[in-house]
Amino acid sequence: MRAAFWVGCAALLLSACSSEPVQQATAAHVAPGLKASMSSSGEANCAMIGGSLSVARQLDGTAIGMCALPNGKRCSEQSLAAGSCGSY
């Protein structure tokens, strides 16, 4: 009985001294005021079809420039250049 008490106390003490860092949500680390960046040709293509530049966050945390089209669709610079964005 006494041994079980000491084992329980030791386990409690060791768990309280854990050095695991506190995890934070990645949204807290997003820099405010992100600016969309596209090449000048991508920017021109987006403006030519009536779109506006926006920023899209990828799953790995990187930000890429996207073209927000008037019909609500969003296309990347590569899709616009390749013509694979569909109808505008």
UniProtKB/Swiss-Prot annotation:
InterPro entries (UniProt xref): DUF333
PANTHER family given in the database record: DUF333 DOMAIN-CONTAINING PROTEIN, HEMOLYSIN-RELATED
Span of the signal peptide: 1-25
Pfam assignment, any one: DUF333
Protein name (record): Uncharacterized protein YdbJ
Keywords assigned by UniProt, alphabetized: Signal
